Amino acid sequence: MLTINSIKNGIVIDHIQAGHGIKIFKYLGLEEADYRVALIMNAESSKLGKKDIIKIENIMEIDYKVLGFIDPTITIDVIENETIKEKIKLELPKTIENVIKCKNPRCITSIENYIPNEFYLVDEENGEYRCKYCDEIYSGGDINKL
């Protein structure tokens, strides 16, 4: 039997698409953490079938826009004294900056490295973003491109 204790203070990143948990874990640099962290993969879920969960025994700064871009179904639970203080449901952010790079070699961001890569959401249903400078379309949510 698998037992993972509750955390006293920290955050739980829940409802991660199965298989994406390890990539989010690495993106957040949690393999270097000096506090307790649990990555649960392929947990049963009534909504998703299977899901990943990350439990972090520490309050840390996380860019919710990036997590929403990776997977808008993620829920963040902020835990204090072993109870959920706040539940944050993520969604696709309207804009993202320096999360992905424009793939257009003629884009100003490819030529001038000091210009931030900025994208804005153009199709929420398909998760498509458009480069602010050259209008190149990027389909969001592909964690492999981070």
From Swiss-Prot:
Gene3D superfamilies: Aspartate carbamoyltransferase regulatory subunit, C-terminal domain, Aspartate carbamoyltransferase regulatory subunit, N-terminal domain. GO terms for biological process: 'de novo' pyrimidine nucleobase biosynthetic process; pyrimidine nucleotide biosynthetic process. Zn(2+) binds at residues 102, 107, 131, 134. Its cofactor is Zn(2+). Contains catalytic and regulatory chains. NCBIfam families: PRK00893.1-3. This is Aspartate carbamoyltransferase regulatory chain. The gene is pyrI.
